Amino acid sequence: MKTTKSGSRVMAAVLTAAALGVLAQGTAHAEQYQSGATRWDIKGGKLMMVAGVLDDNSRLHYLNYAFYVQASDNALYLAPIVDDPKKLNDYRLNFSTFNGGGEILTDAVVAVKGASTYLVTAHKDAVHGYNRPAAVTTRTYRLVEGDEAQWRWYFAPVAQGAYSEQQNYTVERALAETAKALH
């Protein structure tokens, strides 16, 4: 096959682009959100999630999600995740994702449905190893505006879900279906 000088340049550009695409795919992670800030318009202001990489190597990938509400007065409030609304002193200031062996094992998604804002978390129990069928559990929290005696904003639990090993759910599918069913 005979190629011209410009044809060689085009071929080199195509091969370089393909190689960069393969490299980018190899380092991509499939969490719902990437490192950085994501914002949603919510009742009472804006919800901001800041995602930062905790650890990143060829096998394991963690992201740390922290949530803030920018109120209508422009004040920025940290929005913790509480496991029991009656015990607001039992809280987490962040949520960590986990991607192991190329599979998401723990992740979360934010869903804004009308005046309500939800955080849905999902975890796959990988006791039999990565990329194998396992039970997936979900937990749904609603963003609540507190008063002076509480957190100004916080995520309170409203529901739990479970998908059996036989259903062979992924974390992504459990998150998508749970978020879609919210009202």
Language model segments and positions:
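Intrinsically disordered, glycine/charged-rich N-terminal periplasmic/extracytoplasmic linker segments
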Residues: 2-4, 22-26
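Bacterial N-terminal signal peptides that target proteins for export
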Residues: 2-14
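A general, composition-driven signal for non-globular sequence regions
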Residues: 3, 19, 84-86
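Residues in flexible loops and secondary-structure boundaries
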Residues: 9, 22-23, 113
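Bacterial N-terminal signal peptides
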Residues: 12-22
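Exposed acidic/polar residues on beta-strands and adjacent loops within beta-sheet cores, strongest
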Residues: 26-183
